[in-house]
From Swiss-Prot:
Its cofactor is heme. Belongs to the cytochrome f family. Binds 1 heme group covalently. Keywords: Chloroplast, Electron transport, Heme, Iron, Membrane, Metal-binding, Photosynthesis, Plastid, Signal, Thylakoid, Transmembrane, Transmembrane helix, Transport. Component of the cytochrome b6-f complex, which mediates electron transfer between photosystem II (PSII) and photosystem I (PSI), cyclic electron flow around PSI, and state transitions. HAMAP family: Cytb6_f_cytF. Disulfide bonds: none annotated. One of its GO terms (molecular function) is electron transfer activity. InterPro entries: Cyt-f_TM (IPR024058), Cyt_f (IPR002325), Cyt_f_lg_dom (IPR024094), Cyt_f_lg_dom_sf (IPR036826), Rudment_hybrid_motif (IPR011054). The gene is petA. This is Cytochrome f. The keyword Oxidoreductase does not apply. The 4 large subunits of the cytochrome b6-f complex are cytochrome b6, subunit IV (17 kDa polypeptide, petD), cytochrome f and the Rieske protein, while the 4 small subunits are PetG, PetL, PetM and PetN. The complex functions as a dimer. The keyword Plastid applies.
Amino acid sequence: MQTRNTFSWTWIREEITRSISVSLMIYIITWSSISNAYPIFAQQNYENPREATGRIVCANCHLANKPVDIEVPQAVLPDTVFEAVVKIPYDMQLKQVLANGKKGALNVGAVLILPEGFELAPPDRISPEMKEKIGNLSFQNYRPNKKNILVIGPVPGQKYSEITFPILAPDPATNKDVHFLKYPIYVGGNRGRGQIYPDGSKSNNTVYNATAGGIISKILRKEKGGYEITIADASNGRQVIDIIPRGLELLVSEGESIKLDQPLTSNPNVGGFGQGDAEIVLQDPLRVQGLLFFLGSVVLAQIFLVLKKKQFEKVQLSEMNF
């Protein structure tokens, strides 16, 4: 009985360990495949997502240029919550090459660079209507100390091609670094995977070119997908092997003569990155009240002018009758 209990506990412990290991491997593989060239890479490699030139660093990995749009109110009052809607349009029928070489739907991601003092609205300040627009999205700060820079993604593009950010406007009365001015807002949005990793290596979502000119002497299809293309360089007699990852379509065949940098594969990329900007005014409530008072005064003056004119006309009419 003692031996049987020991065996049972040993077997259970081994099964638990095996399950944890498998789960961890699945998580790592899944995370690696979906996070390629998404905001996590920018967060890991750049202190600020916007370079001094105005270029957003996501463009370093997403080489294709695609449109993105942002809608914000023209003006907001201090300590109020407003919507910043980022639109990332694309053809929903398109499929992209995934890291495993298969075809799948496109994901989207975005980075929103707000003026200093503006930040993500706390949940208790977000209205039910705005929460419905946000859906299940989970936003995060680009850095713990950069609350004005928000990132999201990757998320399913078919559901979130429009992303609503709930933003809390600052109050100059409590934040002396903020003033009642017009401020710029910058946005970057991508759909689909990137072509370049931060270390400079290529993903399988881009074109692969020949690293040498010559004759293709052999094309080996690898067991797990992808190809090894052997190029015989006639100029020096050496052989060069180009590795093509899985999921790409070859444009060349054995015996074909090719040139240096000639495309070996078609371009699988159907996504891309775009950036845009908008302006927003942090409006002084006293200025609004003053404007309303001025407009009210103008309206009253017009009314009194009309009444006075009618009174004058009556006096003139009575004098003529007399």
